[in-house]
Amino acid sequence: MTPGGDLLRKSLIASERDEATRTAWRVRTSPVDPARFVWVDETGSHVALTPTHARAPRGERAAGRVPRNRGRITTLIAALTVDGMGPALLLEGGVDTDAFVAYVTGLLAPSLRSGQIVVLDNLAAHHAARVRSAIERQGAEAWFLPAYSPDLTPIEEAFSKLKALLRRAGARTRDALADAIRPALRAITPADALGWYAHCGYPPPGQLL
């Protein structure tokens, strides 16, 4: 105990975060039926993922084996709705504008319904004119999150569960990693999605924050 209270681990947030913009986002989204939102983002994986916790006899350290060579990153582009995970695309390496446009035009846009709102962060590839036009041709809209606000998108929590499942799978080849990602995506349920929506401030009608 310190004179000013307990000594706790700090929760760090980006100093560039603009609270006025975040408040405006809350005002904009609060009247919207959460079922209209389609959250789209990317996450990276590799062939050296391993569980971060393990059991060991009392007084001994838990140890595990993991490859030091992670290989090239595998990127997953995916969407989350109240029904769970939507269209997904696996890429070798990172995401550039052409890759993201290919995902949107080939997978995401055909799945959209008129009136849906695709929510994206501010990655440069997300702002490509071809992305917005493909979304709007389906009668949907593209909205962009406030900068430095991963806490406002429930797909971040979906990716957290996905990574936990991949750590448990322990894939050590690219093919094994791809094979592990598919069932991990299916393991994300509508109940998961609704919980994450509510946690991020988008509760379904009738559910209080």
Regions found by a protein language model. Give the residues of each.
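Short functional hotspots at interaction and active-site rims
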Residues: 1-209
